[in-house]
Amino acid sequence: MKRLIIFDLDGTLLDTLEDLCDATNYALRSENFPERSLDEVRNFVGNGIRLLIERAVPQGTPPAVTDRVFGVFKSYYADHCMIKTVPYAGIADALRLLKAQGCLLGVVSNKADAPAKAIVAHYFPAVFDSVVGEREGVRKKPAPDAVFETVKALGCTIDELVYVGDSDVDAQTAQNAGCCCVLVSWGFRERALLESFSPSAVVDTAEELLKELIK
């Protein structure tokens, strides 16, 4: 069993898709842009909220208009990020069991730092030893910077780490960090894509994830 487990947030621990979609469409409506479907937003997420909005606005939208939409999104999502969001089945229990086993637990997310911390504190109080979201001056995933920051802050080494995520971005993050990777199939990407990165495992339930992590 690894000493430190770092989790992605959206699509791994929490199903945040409906709140993200609602905030995206609220922001798009502010400029009378067409709304996006849940499946479209699913494909847009993973690289941070700025890229989510850049992908959601119509092609050819002037940068200044994209900036306005992004501002509306950030303001709305900050107040509406926990309306429909729910933990995936079995995740809360799995985290408690890992904590009881003495594991250090962290979150590294491309979600903005403030809402990432607020959401984790709300849904998983007193569970995580570190939560790091997107901040200015720190490269977001798949760059390994926030992973390295977490490893150092918790007094661990890369060899003591397993990274858990649900996307190609997460697989690339683990590869760039040089650490073990487990991917979950219940998130925002198809299983075939996840398997193409040859992770240590692709799991389908929280119970399977727990078994993989405590081996």
Where do the PLM segments sit?
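Asp-based, Mg2+/Mn2+-dependent phosphohydrolase catalytic module
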Residues: 1-3, 113, 117-215
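Active-site neighborhood of HAD-like aspartate-dependent phosphohydrolases
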Residues: 2-43
